């Protein structure tokens, strides 16, 4: 899960640079939407990794 969280963080940062930096031109709106989706998925997967890892370590 943490792997996916880091992937979505990188995707979000790249899309943010393209969308908010104005490099994307016609794709600015799409890049901004995908940026927020990627950041939301990063948060979800980071929390899942945190809580799942804690439950696994507690059961050992």
UniProtKB/Swiss-Prot annotation:
The keyword NAD does not apply. Coiled coil: none annotated. It is a multi-pass membrane protein. The keyword Ligase does not apply. It is found in: Cell membrane. Keywords: Cell membrane, Membrane, Transmembrane, Transmembrane helix. The chain crosses the membrane at residues 4-24, 33-53. Its main location: membrane. GO terms for cellular component: plasma membrane. Belongs to the UPF0391 family. HAMAP family: UPF0391. This is UPF0391 membrane protein Swit_2334. The lineage of its organism: Bacteria, Pseudomonadati, Pseudomonadota, Alphaproteobacteria, Sphingomonadales.
């Amino acid at each position: 899960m943490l792997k996916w969280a880091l992937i979505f963080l990188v995707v979000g940062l790249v899309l943010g640079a393209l969308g908010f930096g104005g490099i994307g031109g016609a794709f600015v709106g799409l890049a901004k939407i995908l940026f927020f989706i990627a950041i939301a998925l990063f948060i979800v997967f980071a929390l899942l990794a945190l809580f799942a890892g804690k439950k696994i370590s507690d059961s050992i």
